[in-house]
Amino acid sequence: MEKQDRIKYLVDILNKYAYHYYTLDDPLIADSEYDVLYDELVNLEKETGIVLPNSPTNRIGGEVLSGFEKHEHLNTLYSLGKAQSKEEVRNWVDKTIEFVQNYNENHVNKLPKVEFYVEFKFDGLTVNLTYDGGYLVMATTRGNGTIGEVITSQVKTINSIPLKIKDTRLMEIQGEGVMPLSSLENYNKTHEPKLKNARNAAAGALRNLDPAVTRERNLDAYFYNVNYLQDNELETQEEMIKFLGDNYFKLYPYEKHATSFEEVSKFIDEIFELRNEIDVLTDGVVIKVNDFKTREKLGYTNKFPRWAIAYKFEPERFTTIVKEVEWNVGRTGKVTPTALLEPVEIGNVTVKRATLNNIDDIERKQVRLNSEVFVRRSNDVIPEIMGVVNPDQEDTEEIEIPHYCPYCHSELFRDGVHIFCPNSMSCTPQLVKRMVHFASRNAMNIDGLSEKTLEVLLEKLNIKSIEEIYDVKKEQLMQLDGFKEKKSQNLINAIEKSKNVDLANFIFALGIPEIGEKTSFELAQKYKSFDNLREAKFEELIQIEDIGNVIAEEIVEFFHDETISNSIDSLLSKGIKIKNPENIEKKLDNLTFVLTGSLVNYSRKELTDKLSNLGAKVSSSVSKNTDYVVYGEKAGSKLTKAKDLGVKLMTEDELNSFLDNL
């Protein structure tokens, strides 16, 4: 259970951190801390073979805010794989060189000797600029890699960004919007509240709906990539950089070429020494293969290009004192410690908290109350405690491990390095988080039933179980602060609408340990009805792809737990009608679809899942291998490209007719 439990924890916490970092521009932890957790998840997934559907390893990036107009990029904006040590850089360099050598041994048309391009990695906000006819026509954020948010007005306040360039072809140019450290210092002399760091200042300015705010922060931008170019003739990174310079894009005056790890390592050290002398926040180095044909042969993972890697510098360490430890309860009942620190200034940020993973983390690092500890961070909020300064420090006290839940006072139990509250039915934090999961879009999809709303319902209406959601009356809601006629009716309508639910969504909503969306779908397809699933046998379950012994045991135990079974029966008595799945044949095998524009009857994810379940591949970019492009309103350049290539086009209605006739 311990490894599976750890995977689930890592997926949940990394998704939370990614949401705050990419979507809210309100990072909760340092990049280095995120990378450590991410690498741990990758290793555990490889070791166990368990990859949850919502794992960040499946993702390219973060979610898109609804406050800005959306825009589809002409090509996917990939993030970069990260190396945490020089040894990892060496391995990447060696693998790349070996790949080219093996390729050349087996092909007549040889690839050139591998040359690496080494450059600064700046810490700001990625901007993607679209030029057509020589003019800037669109500027967007990276968004989730496929769809960004339009920030054209904000970007135009940056004087270093050209509004007109020489080349008249359609193109996308990628760069980094940054706030120079001198601009940050000058801004803080005359403004309150003061900005905490340059990265958040740049991101916040570019994501502000008022361009006047952006202009006031005196941003800059550096460019490093041509993401798309019509009739692209560029063959190397070196040619690309020259093309950017010739078209008035600002380049950072540092570029080095290397043919070996030793040379790459030398340039990494050089940039590390220069980083505190420059006027821009930098947190590492980017290393790319120079030749584009070699890049094409190396290709991509679903998240990163194999031809580039980012090396992040080890953050500086500081010391502070652990004053207290608080214990918080999650959806699964896990009780997690958080260290409250004596405030310490790190990189213009006042740090007061640090997450401690578990009891083992406390014991292994010998952390005690009043201990002087090493903490480290890059440019984000919550640091990592590395260990104590002096294990023999005398004026410290042992951190008391709680025996009773800090919320419901139930007796806790220990499982491995974690402690849990067993009171899953009425422990408020657990109940709230389970209800949030139950109401989430890919579960029962109760629009408007947020965590904040649920906390109010539990407190004011004395709701004690999930099924009581369906007993809430409009009159009760209208008595609560913030609930008027329309909001109350909308929530009641959403609750009522959720009673008609697909079997896969209902299975996912129950929150069975280790069961994500993909496994819920597979269970629905296998058992066809909820009654059949409740009677599932261990021997049957382990025959299903992606379900091993541990997950099979979890499912059997879940449905044989008397309390859970009674709760499910009570839930079903509220009028829940479960739609059983039809037999799905893979009728779209070997067909590739691309979606573009705003859809009416589906979210992009819903339609992607629908097509994927029928065997289709849904791609993020149009090519000659695309079979169909499905387009909605405000379809962008992908539609134009599809027309140019002669790809078959479908409206949403035409797609529905097409699927109905399969």
Swiss-Prot record:
The gene is ligA. Residues 583-662 form the BRCT domain. NAD(+) binds at D31, S32, E33, Y34, D35, S79, L80, E119, R142, E176, K288, K312. The active site is at K121 (n6-amp-lysine intermediate). Zn(2+) binds at C405, C408, C421, C427. One of its GO terms (molecular function) is DNA ligase (NAD+) activity. Its EC number is 6.5.1.2. It comes from the Bacteria. GO terms for cellular component: cytosol. PROSITE patterns: BRCT, DNA_LIGASE_N2. This is DNA ligase. Keywords: DNA damage, DNA repair, DNA replication, Ligase, Magnesium, Manganese, Metal-binding, NAD, Zinc. Belongs to the NAD-dependent DNA ligase family. LigA subfamily. It comes from Finegoldia magna (strain ATCC 29328 / DSM 20472 / WAL 2508) (Peptostreptococcus magnus). GO terms for biological process: DNA repair; DNA replication. It catalyses: NAD(+) + (deoxyribonucleotide)n-3'-hydroxyl + 5'-phospho-(deoxyribonucleotide)m = (deoxyribonucleotide)n+m + AMP + beta-nicotinamide D-nucleotide. NCBIfam families: dnlj, PRK07956.1. HAMAP family: DNA_ligase_A. DNA ligase that catalyzes the formation of phosphodiester linkages between 5'-phosphoryl and 3'-hydroxyl groups in double-stranded DNA using NAD as a coenzyme and as the energy source for the reaction. It is essential for DNA replication and repair of damaged DNA. Its cofactor is Mg(2+); Mn(2+).
